[in-house]
Amino acid sequence: MIVKILSSNDTGETGGHQAGILVPKKSELLDFFPKLNSSTKNPRTVMTLSDEHGEGWSFNFIYYNNKFFGGTRNEYRLTGMTKYIRSNGLKAGDEIHFSKDNPGYRLKSKKNNVSEGPIKLTGSWITVKTKI
């Protein structure tokens, strides 16, 4: 199982646009996801996941590798998650738990209610505004 703690950028709270949730290039994370053919430009696959209510969700796992094809990007992303995040009312600090289940993938959300505003990151310090 892997867990993604959502940032305000992941949830759209910053108002910015990003091309999906960044998946760090760590083997323990990448081994969880389907294998992609890195010899092709921007390989991707559709992942079908079931949530704790039995509802199916489709996300795209993409390796933006155009750096090796004349571009600038070299990163993995999980895209197509906006509807899931919004329908579950997820905010910065909440979690999405991903697990493998025969024959596919499962996910579940966990609301942490840690913040009334965006989590502010400054260097290695994290300031969290908690509810009293």
Where are the regions a protein language model picked out?
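Acidic, low-complexity intrinsically disordered regions
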Residues: 1-132
